[in-house]
Amino acid sequence: MNVTKKQAYIIGGIALVGLGVGAYFLFKKDSGEYDEKAAEKQANAPEVTVGKTGVKVKATPEYREELLKFAKSTELKETTRALLNNMNMSWIGRDKEQIKSLIYDRIATDDHMKILKAYFHCHKFSHGIYNKCWDLTYWLKHALGSDDWNAMTLKYPSLQIPLVCSCKK
């Protein structure tokens, strides 16, 4: 096989680029993979209040900005509106899978859940024998089955702490 010097350099360059691309994909961190430096930075972060929500979280400045953006987002308002629409349906018309997908798809972390709880606050619920003023915690506890509720509290531990509600009549 006759290969000129120019062709050898081209083949070598392509091989080198291929090795670089292969090494990148081999050694890159997967999204969601544990990052020790980021975890240490988050653990040493000061506790701050997120905007006007009154929610206190340990957050780095970047994470605090992300939480502030979420607290002001239309996604938070749309999620709350969808949950309230579902809350006002009768027990027969309620779709547990829709409730779970709303929360799991739109609420990334427990800190985001704290903001949703603060925004949702307390609402009057009156269907059948119930005529109660519930926060998000009590409503989800009654709307979901025990297995779904337990799974949700594992991902969002702040759901275990209900708000004290008193709706005016």
Language-model region placement:
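Single-pass alpha-helical membrane anchors
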Residues: 2-30
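Long, charge-enriched amphipathic alpha-helical scaffolds and associated charged IDRs
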Residues: 27-169
